[in-house]
Amino acid sequence: ASAYLDMVARLWEGPIILVGHSKGGNLAIYAAMNADPKVRKRIQHVYSLDGPGFPPEIVTSPAYRTIQPKVTKIVPSSSIVGMIFETPEPCRVVSSDSDGIMQHSAFTWLLDGDQFITEPDLSSSSQLFNEELNHWIATLTPEQRERAVDALFTVLASQDYAAIQGTLESSYQICMSHRVDHR
């Protein structure tokens, strides 16, 4: 991602704004963190649209701390994907005309003219689910974390809503059993 950003930056001399949805939001932040220093100076802002965060070792790194002031994360009120891992950057919570994981589609986010309709915070169910999911993810090895996140994105990319709902119900049961077993 950073090599691609550096290549495109050679074709454009002006200021740069990066935007990505889902895994693309994560990659936009990653690219900004790892871009050539001259390119990094041209980055005005990075928008992550319901993109996952990063593990603690990344968000505490100097590269992340350098780019963090330029990052805004935009998530729907029932965000799951955008709240995976650490999310220290400011989040704008937006309204959606869908429920649950279906809010991940930015096409469901509500607008008033050319502005998002915002909410004061994530829904309480989203906050609880994300707390438990991230607690469970923290117990995984890096390889297991990578496989778990890749599996989630594979299911999301398939747009098989029954599979997505089943995956979330299983994840919820795993998280809640982990909560009972480990508290």
Regions found by a protein language model. Give the residues of each.
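Alpha/beta hydrolase fold serine-hydrolase catalytic domain that processes acyl esters and thioesters
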Residues: S2-P15, P37-R183
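Gly/Ala-rich beta-loop-alpha elbow adjacent to hydrolase catalytic centers
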Residues: V19-G24, A28
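Short glycine-enriched nucleophile-adjacent loop
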Residues: L27-P37
